[in-house]
């Protein structure tokens, strides 16, 4: 790593306690992430701070209560990275959650294989129809609700515009959204 690098936000997507490693997900947008693209397993950062921010509200709830809730995660693009560990944690504790992953096109759909192993049901949407259902994530939410799914809570993580429209729809549908 370089000692003169800039501070950038990174998302911890997974970890291995035994190996002492974390998996991070990032989108190449500048010099620092361009350099990181070439890192190999075992390469190190000069400095890494985190995690920052707040933990998932789900961590504060009783597992037995969560088992009785119908949970929907909606992930957009790199927003899939912070969704994965939450769904994995729920799965490890016997709680099913449905997941919608959306992206502008197939190349922006990430962590599909990993998510498939922990999600109750996984739905993929792409704006251009290059993979999964054609359209935006809100179309998929509406389809699921129209099919009789009654979600108690929705966790949406992704681009601001996606979260705005997810919250608008879930509010109309009476689904508590985080």
Ranges and model annotations:
Residues 1-41:
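Ferredoxin-reductase
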Residues 31-178:
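FNR/FR-type flavoprotein reductase catalytic core
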